[in-house]
Protein backbone atom coordinates (compact mmCIF):
# COMPACT_ATOMS: atom_id res chain seq x y z
CA UNK A 1 0.00 0.00 0.00
CA UNK A 2 2.68 2.51 0.99
CA UNK A 3 4.58 1.72 -2.20
CA UNK A 4 1.54 2.56 -4.32
CA UNK A 5 0.91 5.72 -2.28
CA UNK A 6 4.47 6.97 -2.78
CA UNK A 7 4.04 6.79 -6.53
CA UNK A 8 0.66 8.49 -6.30
CA UNK A 9 2.09 11.48 -4.44
CA UNK A 10 5.09 11.69 -6.77
CA UNK A 11 2.91 11.75 -9.91
CA UNK A 12 3.32 15.01 -11.81
CA UNK A 13 0.62 17.34 -13.09
CA UNK A 14 -0.57 16.65 -16.68
CA UNK A 15 1.87 18.94 -18.44
CA UNK A 16 4.93 17.25 -16.89
CA UNK A 17 6.54 13.85 -17.53
CA UNK A 18 4.14 10.96 -17.13
CA UNK A 19 6.45 7.99 -16.46
CA UNK A 20 5.84 8.21 -12.71
CA UNK A 21 2.09 8.43 -13.30
CA UNK A 22 2.23 5.22 -15.36
CA UNK A 23 4.25 3.49 -12.63
CA UNK A 24 1.74 4.67 -10.02
CA UNK A 25 -1.12 3.23 -12.07
CA UNK A 26 0.66 -0.13 -12.29
CA UNK A 27 1.46 -0.16 -8.55
CA UNK A 28 -2.09 0.76 -7.52
CA UNK A 29 -3.64 -1.72 -9.96
CA UNK A 30 -1.43 -4.47 -8.51
CA UNK A 31 -2.41 -3.47 -4.98
CA UNK A 32 -6.13 -3.56 -5.84
CA UNK A 33 -5.89 -7.01 -7.44
CA UNK A 34 -3.76 -8.35 -4.58
CA UNK A 35 -5.87 -6.89 -1.73
CA UNK A 36 -9.42 -6.53 -3.06
CA UNK A 37 -10.77 -6.68 0.53
CA UNK A 38 -8.61 -3.77 1.74
CA UNK A 39 -10.51 -1.15 3.73
CA UNK A 40 -8.81 1.48 1.55
CA UNK A 41 -9.90 -0.05 -1.76
CA UNK A 42 -12.22 2.83 -2.69
CA UNK A 43 -9.52 5.42 -2.06
CA UNK A 44 -7.18 3.45 -4.32
CA UNK A 45 -9.82 3.23 -7.03
CA UNK A 46 -10.32 7.01 -6.84
CA UNK A 47 -6.57 7.52 -7.16
CA UNK A 48 -6.55 5.25 -10.19
CA UNK A 49 -9.28 7.33 -11.85
CA UNK A 50 -7.43 10.54 -11.11
CA UNK A 51 -4.12 9.24 -12.47
CA UNK A 52 -5.77 7.89 -15.62
CA UNK A 53 -7.37 11.29 -16.05
CA UNK A 54 -3.94 12.91 -15.87
CA UNK A 55 -2.62 10.66 -18.63
CA UNK A 56 -5.69 11.35 -20.74
CA UNK A 57 -5.22 15.11 -20.30
CA UNK A 58 -1.50 14.86 -21.06
CA UNK A 59 -2.28 13.03 -24.28
CA UNK A 60 -4.71 15.78 -25.28
CA UNK A 61 -2.27 18.58 -24.38
CA UNK A 62 0.50 16.99 -26.47
CA UNK A 63 -1.75 16.93 -29.52
CA UNK A 64 -3.04 20.45 -28.85
CA UNK A 65 0.54 21.75 -28.63
CA UNK A 66 1.25 20.48 -32.16
CA UNK A 67 -1.91 22.25 -33.31
CA UNK A 68 -0.94 25.53 -31.61
CA UNK A 69 2.51 25.63 -33.22
CA UNK A 70 1.12 24.83 -36.67
CA UNK A 71 2.41 21.27 -36.99
CA UNK A 72 -0.90 20.07 -38.34
CA UNK A 73 0.20 16.68 -39.63
CA UNK A 74 1.64 15.79 -36.22
CA UNK A 75 -1.46 17.22 -34.53
CA UNK A 76 -3.77 14.97 -36.56
CA UNK A 77 -1.72 11.87 -35.68
CA UNK A 78 -1.55 12.84 -32.00
CA UNK A 79 -5.29 13.64 -31.74
CA UNK A 80 -6.18 10.32 -33.41
CA UNK A 81 -3.85 8.42 -31.06
CA UNK A 82 -5.36 10.21 -28.06
CA UNK A 83 -8.86 9.12 -29.13
CA UNK A 84 -7.73 5.56 -29.76
CA UNK A 85 -6.00 5.33 -26.39
CA UNK A 86 -8.73 7.11 -24.40
CA UNK A 87 -12.09 6.54 -26.14
CA UNK A 88 -13.83 7.64 -22.92
CA UNK A 89 -12.16 11.09 -22.96
CA UNK A 90 -14.41 14.00 -22.00
CA UNK A 91 -12.56 16.00 -24.67
CA UNK A 92 -13.85 13.99 -27.62
CA UNK A 93 -15.69 16.91 -29.22
CA UNK A 94 -12.63 19.18 -28.95
CA UNK A 95 -10.37 16.47 -30.31
CA UNK A 96 -12.63 15.89 -33.33
CA UNK A 97 -12.94 19.65 -33.86
CA UNK A 98 -9.18 20.28 -33.78
CA UNK A 99 -8.54 17.27 -36.00
CA UNK A 100 -10.88 18.71 -38.63
CA UNK A 101 -9.36 22.20 -38.43
CA UNK A 102 -5.84 20.74 -38.53
CA UNK A 103 -6.73 18.71 -41.62
CA UNK A 104 -8.11 21.84 -43.30
CA UNK A 105 -5.06 23.95 -42.47
CA UNK A 106 -2.79 21.15 -43.65
CA UNK A 107 -4.72 21.03 -46.94
CA UNK A 108 -4.58 24.80 -47.51
CA UNK A 109 -0.84 24.88 -46.79
CA UNK A 110 -0.01 21.84 -48.94
CA UNK A 111 1.69 21.62 -52.29
CA UNK A 112 -0.86 21.39 -55.09
CA UNK A 113 -0.29 17.68 -55.73
CA UNK A 114 -1.44 16.84 -52.18
CA UNK A 115 -4.31 19.29 -51.85
CA UNK A 116 -7.12 17.27 -53.41
CA UNK A 117 -6.58 14.26 -51.12
CA UNK A 118 -6.24 16.51 -48.09
CA UNK A 119 -9.41 18.47 -48.80
CA UNK A 120 -11.23 15.16 -49.25
CA UNK A 121 -9.78 13.95 -45.93
CA UNK A 122 -10.92 17.18 -44.25
CA UNK A 123 -14.47 16.53 -45.46
CA UNK A 124 -14.32 13.02 -43.95
CA UNK A 125 -13.36 14.51 -40.56
CA UNK A 126 -16.09 17.11 -40.96
CA UNK A 127 -18.80 14.50 -41.61
CA UNK A 128 -17.62 12.42 -38.63
CA UNK A 129 -17.76 15.51 -36.43
CA UNK A 130 -21.20 16.67 -37.59
CA UNK A 131 -22.57 13.13 -37.32
CA UNK A 132 -21.50 13.04 -33.69
CA UNK A 133 -22.12 16.69 -32.70
CA UNK A 134 -24.84 18.16 -34.96
CA UNK A 135 -25.57 20.97 -32.46
CA UNK A 136 -21.95 21.87 -31.71
CA UNK A 137 -20.89 25.47 -31.08
CA UNK A 138 -18.24 24.78 -33.77
CA UNK A 139 -20.83 23.87 -36.40
CA UNK A 140 -20.89 27.18 -38.27
CA UNK A 141 -17.10 27.40 -38.48
CA UNK A 142 -16.82 23.80 -39.68
CA UNK A 143 -19.66 24.28 -42.17
CA UNK A 144 -17.62 27.11 -43.71
CA UNK A 145 -14.54 24.90 -43.85
CA UNK A 146 -16.58 22.14 -45.53
CA UNK A 147 -17.92 24.64 -48.09
CA UNK A 148 -14.37 25.75 -48.90
CA UNK A 149 -13.30 22.13 -49.31
CA UNK A 150 -16.21 21.40 -51.63
CA UNK A 151 -15.44 24.53 -53.69
CA UNK A 152 -11.84 23.41 -54.13
CA UNK A 153 -12.87 19.86 -55.03
CA UNK A 154 -15.51 21.02 -57.54
CA UNK A 155 -13.12 23.49 -59.21
CA UNK A 156 -10.24 21.06 -59.48
CA UNK A 157 -11.91 17.73 -60.13
CA UNK A 158 -12.60 18.43 -63.83
CA UNK A 159 -9.04 19.47 -64.57
CA UNK A 160 -7.69 16.21 -63.12
CA UNK A 161 -8.95 14.01 -65.98
Which stretches of residues belong to each language-model region?
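Acidic, polar-rich low-complexity tracts and alpha-helical solenoid repeat scaffolds
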Residues: 1-161
Amino acid sequence: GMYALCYYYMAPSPERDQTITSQAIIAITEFISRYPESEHINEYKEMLDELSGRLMEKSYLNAYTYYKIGRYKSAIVAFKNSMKQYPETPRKEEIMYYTTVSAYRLATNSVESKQMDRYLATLDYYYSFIGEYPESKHKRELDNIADNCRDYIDKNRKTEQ
